[in-house]
Amino acid sequence: MNRRELAGRLQTMGTASRAALAKSLGLSQPTAGKIVDQLLKEGIVEEIDTTAEPGAAKAGRPPQLLRLDRRHRRFLAIQLGVTDTRLATLPVGVAEEDHWDFQFPTPACAQAWRAGLAKIARRIARTEFWGVLVSIPGVVDEQTGRVVFSPNLHWTEGDKLPSLIRSVWDAPVVLVQEERALALGHQVVKPGAPGFLLVDFGEGIGSALLVRGRLQTNPLPISGEIGHTPVFGNTRWCGCGARGCLETLVSRRGLLQSLAEHSKRRNPQWAVLVQRTQQRGVEPWLARTLDQTAIVIAGALNMVGLQQVIITGALLELTPEVFRHLAQAITCGAMWGRFGKIEVQPAPRRRMAGLIASGLDRLIWPASQAQERSGHEFASAPN
């Protein structure tokens, strides 16, 4: 039993006493208490003052409750998106849903992006962080901090991003492929599923697999590029250089292009599509796109042997009938649907929770374990 497991259990429970944590993990209270004391010292866990709660005095001395630290902003999170870049300072005990503090349009070159970061940095009071956690699209080698290929943001390719970010904030930088961050965040907030395929719709369409509580890893850094599956009959060119990719149909841009073609509107905005689906439901052109999307997702389920799909992103902004159509089509196409139940669930994006989990896994737990082996305590960041 280590810090990681106890902190993970506390994340699931929300708040708990030392005794409750010990019982849930099958530990003796002294053992659990020792781990808790270490986490308190490291600034990962905090104690909650329950003496001010109504009825506390009447019930006698209540047990001291614990939770993941929510007071101290330990990390800086960055979402590098195709159209916008968002930033937030985050504690270890992050909220279940994302709320970003700062935003600026993602520019077309690295130096302009750095200038945008520097401008935001002047507005952030805290200057020392345990790490800078970056959600990034494309094919990302997370271990080496290199963007192998980014169809929609070619300027991010290579290994320049970590050093560019460190020129603004002097802290370790962790790159996390964006759909993997979303899947990990969903698992942190909603634990217990044996596995799921998360599919996110936005400026592109990507996915991530989580099996037995862990993100799937592969020999190659590429994974989850479901949006670059070619669709028969689709002649649109994709930013990856290929023709016919699924995301040219079902990304925001792809859906708006189809709306323009079928409504004779020039350059319709997303709000127009939202309103149109509310008024007309799933029109034939949209039904075809959803059916083609479902075929690709069902094929992925058939390949990996999962029964749960988590849908996040732009499609959920349309009328609920759109989600229901997609869910039914996935169920019809997945082979397990003939024997058992296919679960297709909508969910909010939980990118921040995934980034924090990645930061702890790749920066904090290895450092504390190494220092423990050497006989030194892990030094928390300044308050």
Predicted regions and their residues:
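Short glycine-aspartate micro-motif
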Residues: 65, 75-79, 129-133, 196-200, ...
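Glycine-rich phosphate-binding loop and adjoining helix at the ATP-binding site
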Residues: 96-195, 322-332
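Short glycine-rich anion-binding loops that position phosphate/pyrophosphate groups of nucleotides
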Residues: 137-140, 202-204, 315-316
